[in-house]
Curated annotation (Swiss-Prot):
Transmembrane segments: none annotated. GO terms for molecular function: magnesium ion binding; mannosyl-3-phosphoglycerate phosphatase activity. It catalyses: 2-O-(alpha-D-mannosyl)-3-phosphoglycerate + H2O = (2R)-2-O-(alpha-D-mannosyl)-glycerate + phosphate. Signal peptide: none annotated. It comes from Escherichia coli O6:H1 (strain CFT073 / ATCC 700928 / UPEC). GO terms for biological process: mannosylglycerate biosynthetic process. Mg(2+) binds at residues 13, 15, 214. Its cofactor is Mg(2+). CDD domains: HAD_Pase (cd07507). This is Mannosyl-3-phosphoglycerate phosphatase. Its main location: cytoplasm.
Length: 271
C-alpha cells in the first residue's frame, strides 16, 4: 500500500482511537509512534479537544512541534518551524468561543433547550465526567472557537436546535461522548486539507495521507484521506464513508490504541 520511506502524513483522532476511551492509555500504539518518529513521518493529532489539552498530550506522546487540529478543525496549531506563516502559532476559523456562548445562552433562555456546557460547570465536574485529573480537566475549558456540551433534551428538540444553529451559521457535531458547537465553515477535513497543502508547498510534493478515527465526527477527516482506518468504537452510529473500498479503508477488530496499531500493521504490511 505504501512504505515507511515515502512522503506520508498520518492524521489521528485521540479519544477512542490513539487513546483508550476509559484509561487514556496509548501504550499499544507506542511502537508504531516510535517507528514513525524515526522515519520522520508526522503524526498529526485531530480532535474535538482544545489546543491546550492537545499540546499537553502531544508532548506526552513525543509529537511536540508538529501541527495539530483542535476543536474539530476550528483551530489549527501550526508546526514550530512554520513561524513565517500568517497566523502563527494558531489559526482560528470563524466564530469565536465567546460568540458561540452568547448564541447558546440566548437559545437556552428564549427557546428553553436543555443542555449543559463545559462553561456551565467547574473543573471538578468535568473531571468527574471524563475521568481526567482536575488540572487536565481545566484545560478542557480553554476553548477558542467551539463549545462542548451534554445534550439533556429530546431528539425532537435536538432537531429544532440544530436547525436554529444552522440558521445562525453554526453546526452541531457529535463526538465520542459529548456534542460540540462550532462555525459551520470549520471542520477536520478543511483543516487537514490546509495542512496537506502546506506540506506540499514546502516540499514540492503531495504526501500520501493516512487517517485514523472512531467516531461520526471523524468521517469528514477520513473522507479526504488517501487511506483510512476506522477504529472499532463505542458510538452506536459508527463511522460511514462514501467510499469504503477495502483497498482504501480498513475497519479494525480491536478498539482504541490496539485498533490504531492494527490499522498501521494492515496498511504497512498489505503490500
Amino acid at each position: 500500500m505504501f512504505s515507511i520511506q515515502q512522503p506520508l502524513l498520518v492524521f489521528s483522532d485521540l479519544d477512542g482511537t490513539l487513546l483508550d476511551s476509559h484509561s487514556y492509555d496509548w501504550q499499544p500504539a507506542a511502537p508504531w509512534l516510535s517507528r514513525l518518529h524515526e522515519a520522520n513521518i508526522p503524526v498529526i493529532l485531530c480532535s474535538s479537544k482544545t489546543s491546550a489539552e492537545m499540546l499537553y498530550l502531544q508532548k506526552m506522546l513525543g509529537l511536540q512541534g508538529l501541527p495539530l487540529i483542535a476543536e474539530n478543525g476550528a483551530v489549527i496549531q501550526l508546526a514550530e518551524q512554520w513561524q513565517d506563516i500568517d497566523g502563527f502559532p494558531r489559526i482560528i476559523s470563524g466564530i469565536s468561543h465567546g460568540e458561540i456562548c452568547q448564541v447558546l445562552n440566548k437559545l437556552r433562555e428564549k427557546e428553553h433547550f436543555k443542555f449543559t456546557t463545559f462553561d456551565d460547570v467547574d473543573d471538578a465536574t468535568i473531571a468527574e465526567w471524563t475521568g481526567l485529573s482536575r488540572s487536565q480537566a481545566a484545560l478542557t475549558q480553554l476553548h477558542e472557537a467551539s463549545v462542548t456540551l451534554i445534550w439533556r433534551d429530546s431528539d425532537e428538540h435536538m432537531a429544532q436546535f440544530i436547525a436554529r444553529l444552522n440558521e445562525l451559521g453554526l453546526q452541531f457535531m457529535q463526538g465520542a461522548r459529548f456534542w460540540h458547537v462550532l462555525d459551520a465553515s470549520a471542520g477536520k477535513d478543511q483543516a487537514a486539507n490546509w495542512i496537506i497543502a502546506t506540506y506540499q508547498q514546502l516540499s514540492g510534493r503531495r504526501p500520501t495521507t493516512l487517517g485514523l478515527g472512531d467516531g461520526p465526527n471523524d468521517a469528514p477527516l477520513l473522507e479526504v484521506m488517501d487511506y483510512a482506518v476506522i477504529v472499532k468504537g463505542l458510538n452506536r452510529e459508527g463511522v460511514h464513508l462514501h467510499d469504503e473500498d477495502p483497498a482504501r479503508v480498513w475497519r479494525t477488530q480491536r478498539e482504541g490504541p490496539e485498533g490504531w496499531r492494527e490499522g498501521l500493521d494492515h496498511f504497512f504490511s498489505a503490500r
